[in-house]
């Protein structure tokens, strides 16, 4: 599965996923997260 995370807030956010780590997103920036088939536990 693919997830697109987009910061629509007027301030910087720290987007995180486990497993996968984190990323700083400025206003309007996005990050893509790919989750492998068969993944049984994850958090965004």
UniProtKB/Swiss-Prot annotation:
It comes from the Eukaryota. Induction: By phytoplasma infection. InterPro entries: Osmotin/thaumatin-like_sf. Coiled coil: none annotated. Belongs to the thaumatin family. This is Thaumatin-like protein 5. It comes from Glebionis coronaria (Crown daisy).
